[in-house]
Amino acid sequence: IDLGIVDPRTMIKIDDTNIGIKEGKNAGLWTVGVARWSTYMNVLPENINNMNNVVIEERLEKSKEKLKQSKPDFIIETLDELPNIIETINIYNSENMNL
């Protein structure tokens, strides 16, 4: 299948696992790791209300540290941050810059 993609750096791989981030890096894509609700937080969204905020923050930090191992271009907590990341990527692409 030819998708007509000339430059893979115009695409973004968003994932919550190191395997997914590595897939994106191997394809030459920008990569974004999402920490909250990541597999590495080990919590279901429906159970979050029953958890202590300190525990949630500890798990979130551990999730970020785990995601850093795959060296994504960006790590965000939630997808709400994605528009800012896309804007940054567009600036880098327009100026032919890499991170």
Where are these regions (language model features)?
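Asp-based, Mg2+/Mn2+-dependent phosphohydrolase catalytic module
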Residues: 1-99
